[in-house]
Swiss-Prot record:
Catalytic activity, reaction form: L-fuculose + ATP = L-fuculose 1-phosphate + ADP + H(+)
Keywords recorded for this protein, A-Z: ATP-binding, Carbohydrate metabolism, Fucose metabolism, Kinase, Nucleotide-binding, Transferase
Organism expressing this protein natively: Salmonella typhi
The name this protein goes by in its record: L-fuculokinase
Record carries keyword Flavoprotein: no
HAMAP family: Fuculokinase (MF_00986)
Pfam families in the cross-refs: FGGY_C, FGGY_N
PANTHER family the record matches: SUGAR KINASE, XYLULOSE KINASE
Transmembrane feature ranges: none
GO process annotations (BP): L-fucose catabolic process
Function: Catalyzes the phosphorylation of L-fuculose.
Length: 472
């Protein structure tokens, strides 16, 4: 008997993947290939995406899974991507201009001068989204100022997930959580902001019908089916922006903060209310729409493991095993014997260590970095509680940084709440599959789909004794 699966097509900045997931959230088959942006012909410093190349990479992944998928029934397809990027298209869906990558510097000047149209504070109060140079708003203003005829000719703007969905189904749609990254929405109305559009001279007609996560978009058309090596007629279900599905797929409940710990740490929460007027007071803050209507995802981000990588390179070597650093830091008592580190190496003139003596070792420096980053997390969590109107009782931790058990224990001790570590790295894929199963009618809600998954967490509890390395 063939196994029913949802096929998740995940377009990341570095990899394109096709992953088949069963009803219990288990991965049945997966394939991956490298993804990369292209250099723009207009300027060698500019970056753009080739939609055709991305579709071909999906095709390569799907065809490499043909043997495994022959034993499955693909019940539905979902697409997840990074946010903000997209393109203007004509009535046939043909790109009028290449997809400007979030890595492209051309829109930085637009961000710096956006006050010509609307104050940055009002912009964030309305949209929730922080001032990041890659925001969709700045791309559209750049196109308006540099290629005005294209906006006049355009049938619509499609975010990158919707560009892919259009190639699959022929439907023109706007994925709601992608729009939530754009800085174009009135986040409280869950629709495009008349005030922002009017101020910047952008037409509402550019944005086609909004679809919620889990909603059917259409069915896989013959040409796309042939390209992917799949049967035509498979339902395509809206899944959208990767961040929101990572939160849901990690098992996060409303009011439970999630820390994605990597080179950057991104702290977000699924909140029923948010005070967006506070956001502009805090650099690095943002708020996006949750995958479920009525919820918001306020968040903050800061450089984290990037600091630790710098410390390793400075005091050890880039190849030194992390366990060597951890063992040396674990031998140092909490408080690092008075050595403290201000960890904002990007923006703070006072960044670096204080309290250094002739007895200070590199273990002190690394431990002080771990404690300094945790103090930064503590401040940001308190800020997020204020913005999102919640009180954290535990912190859910995902990402590469969660493998550092000493750091996890320091977090539990300094925050004085349990740290809950999810080892499964495929949270985005899991979340997208849950909405896919809901969208094809297998479950009555995404939550019911999520209830089928057996989550395995490791806990780090606050303690006053020397750090343990094994979670309970």
């Amino acid at each position: 008997m063939k196994q029913d699966v949802i096929l998740v097509l995940d377009c990341g900045a570095t990899n394109v993947r096709a992953i088949a997931v069963d009803r219990q959230g288990k991965i049945v088959a997966r394939a991956s290939t490298a993804n990369a942006s292209d250099i723009a012909a207009e300027n060698s410093a500019w970056h753009q995406w080739s939609l055709d190349a991305i579709l071909q990479r999906f095709a390569d992944c799907c065809r490499s899974l043909s043997s495994a998928l022959s034993e499955c029934v693909v019940r539905g397809i979902t697409v997840t991507t990074f946010g903000v990027d997209g393109a203007l298209v004509d009535a046939q869906g043909k790109l009028l201009y290449p997809v400007i990558s979030w890595k492209c510097p051309r829109t930085a000047a637009v961000m710096e001068t956006i006050e010509r149209f609307i104050s940055p504070r009002q912009l964030q109060t309305l949209s929730g989204v922080g001032a990041f140079s890659f925001n969709t708003l700045y791309k559209l203003v750049w196109l308006k100022e540099n290629h005005p005829r294209l906006l006049e000719q355009a049938h619509c703007w499609l975010f990158i997930s919707s560009l892919i969905n259009h190639r699959l189904t022929g439907e023109f749609t706007t994925d709601i959580t992608m729009a939530g990254t754009s800085q174009l929405l009135d986040i409280h109305q869950r629709d495009f902001s008349p005030e922002i559009l009017q101020a910047t001279g952008l037409a509402r007609r550019l944005f086609p019908r909004i679809v919620e996560a889990g909603a059917p978009i259409g069915t896989l058309q013959t040409d796309a089916a042939r390209l992917l090596g799949l049967p035509a007629g498979v339902p395509v279900i809206s899944a959208e922006h990767d961040t929101q599905f990572a939160l849901f797929g990690a098992g996060a409940q409303q009011g439970e903060p999630v820390l994605s710990s990597g080179t950057w740490e991104i702290l977000m929460v699924r909140s029923g209310q948010v005070d967006t007027s506070l956001l502009s007071q805090y650099p690095g803050s943002t708020c996006e729409l949750d995958s479920q209507s009525g919820l918001y995802n306020p968040g903050m981000q800061w450089l984290a493991s990037g600091v630790l990588e710098w410390v390793r390179k400075l005091l050890w070597t880039p190849e030194t095993p992390w366990q060597t650093l951890i063992d040396e830091a674990r031998a140092i008592p909490a408080g690092a014997e008075g050595v403290r580190m201000q960890c904002d190496l990007l923006a703070c003139q006072n960044a670096g260590w204080q309290g250094v003596t002739l007895n200070t070792t590199r273990g002190h420096f690394y431990r002080a970095a771990l404690e300094g980053l945790t103090a930064q997390l503590q401040r940001n969590l308190r800020t997020l509680e204020k913005i999102g109107h919640f009180n954290a009782t535990e912190l859910l931790l995902v990402g590469g940084g969660s493998r550092n058990a000493l750091w996890n224990q320091i977090k539990a001790n300094q925050l004085d709440i349990p740290i809950k570590v999810l080892d499964d790295a495929e949270t985005t894929v899991a979340g997208a599959a849950m909405f896919g199963w809901y969208g094809v009618g297998e479950f009555s809600s995404p939550e019911q789909a999520r209830a089928q998954v057996n989550y395995q967490y490791r806990y780090f509890w606050p303690q006053t004794e020397p750090e343990i390395i094994e979670g309970v």
